């Protein structure tokens, strides 16, 4: 079951410059990490006391999952991440609704206790969705 919006991902090759823009908008960095399965560095930003977060996604290594996106479309809106109670169950349910899985199975996310999987919403919407679940010991974002 989808519980809410966790974050909105922005693809950027320059997280420092993009972070300065977010700072000017009043956001502050709250946490971050590396999602090794995707080869990306993630920084999460938030308005004081408010969510959802804004995630800056940048390459952590050559041939990362984000490099093709940056090369083909440039920086910008990358995905919308929804918090779910069970990533595998949502993958199955959404496949049946016509979404195309990017990940065959869930992967570790950039935050502690975070499990993620990506799906593509076909046209006419045509955007990337991230399903996010947190272990019970991790802070729930919704």
Where in this protein do the model-derived segments appear?
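Long, hydrophobic N-terminal alpha-helical segment
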Residues: 1-40, 64
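Short, structured motif recognition centered on aromatic/hydrophobic residues
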Residues: 5-12, 22, 45, 53-57, ...
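Vicinal oxygen chelate
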Residues: 12-20, 24-25, 32-34, 41-46, 52-54, 61, 69-142
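Short connector loops at helix/strand junctions that flank enzyme active sites
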Residues: 40, 49-51, 72-77
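Feature marks short, surface-exposed loop/turn motifs that line or immediately flank catalytic pockets
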Residues: 60-63, 135
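Short, surface-exposed linear segments at secondary-structure transitions and domain or protein termini
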Residues: 63-68, 139-142
């Amino acid at each position: 079951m989808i519980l809410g919006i966790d974050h909105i991902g922005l693809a950027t090759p320059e997280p420092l410059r993009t972070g300065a823009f977010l700072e000017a908008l009043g956001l502050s960095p709250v946490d971050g990490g590396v999602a090794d399965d995707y080869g990306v560095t993630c920084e999460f930003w938030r308005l004081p006391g408010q969510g959802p977060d804004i995630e800056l996604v940048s390459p952590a290594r050559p041939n990362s999952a984000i490099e093709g996106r940056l090369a083909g479309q440039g920086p910008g809106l990358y995905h919308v991440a929804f918090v779910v109670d069970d990533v595998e169950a949502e993958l199955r349910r959404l496949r049946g609704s016509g979404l195309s899985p990017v990940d065959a199975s869930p992967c570790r996310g950039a935050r502690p206790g975070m499990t993620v999987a990506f799906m593509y919403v076909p046209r006419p919407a045509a955007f990337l969705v991230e399903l996010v679940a947190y272990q019970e010991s991790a802070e729930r974002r919704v």
